[in-house]
């Protein structure tokens, strides 16, 4: 079952609790190792790293900080960078992401990364995003399909919440 199928299978109620998104992510990430979570955070942080603005920062925080474990990894990563000025190796990140076999997690990551580069509007980040996913075996058409199907589900969820 893909990420968008997982979303659409959730019980639809007129009012979703605020913690539902964090719980959904926590459930999705439950079987991932710390190394895999670190690779996910690194990918999203790399895409969001172009010159900061409030909208981009908010998008990155929404994607990375709703899960407590991800927040801890992100804080450790920032602290490490401040102390050492070293960044994780891109090839190591790609290799680690390649060990994630859960389709729901991969589709979540595609959608989050794509959302960041859309807000970012940075040509280099866009190129990096598509290059990384190509190395992971995803063609642009597959990315486009995941994004469109996930957006449709998010729009449906917004309509349900606003009833």
Where are these regions (language model features)?
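Small-residue-enriched hydrophobic alpha-helices in membranes
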Residues: 2-48, 55-163
């Amino acid at each position: 079952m893909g990420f968008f199928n997982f979303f659409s299978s959730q019980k639809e109620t007129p009012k979703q609790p605020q913690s539902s998104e964090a719980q959904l992510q926590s459930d999705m990430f439950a079987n991932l190792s710390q190394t895999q979570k670190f690779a996910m955070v690194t990918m999203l942080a790399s895409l969001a790293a172009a010159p900061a603005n409030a909208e981009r920062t908010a998008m990155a925080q929404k994607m990375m900080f709703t899960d407590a474990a991800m927040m801890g990894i992100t804080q450790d990563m920032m602290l490490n960078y401040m102390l050492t000025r070293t960044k994780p190796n891109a090839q190591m990140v790609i290799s680690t992401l390649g060990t994630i076999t859960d389709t729901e997690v991969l589709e979540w990551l595609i959608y989050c990364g794509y959302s960041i580069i859309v807000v970012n509007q940075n040509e280099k980040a866009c190129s990096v995003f598509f290059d990384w996913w190509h190395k992971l075996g995803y063609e642009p058409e597959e990315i486009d399909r995941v994004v469109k199907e996930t957006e449709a589900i998010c729009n449906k969820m917004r309509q349900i919440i606003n009833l």
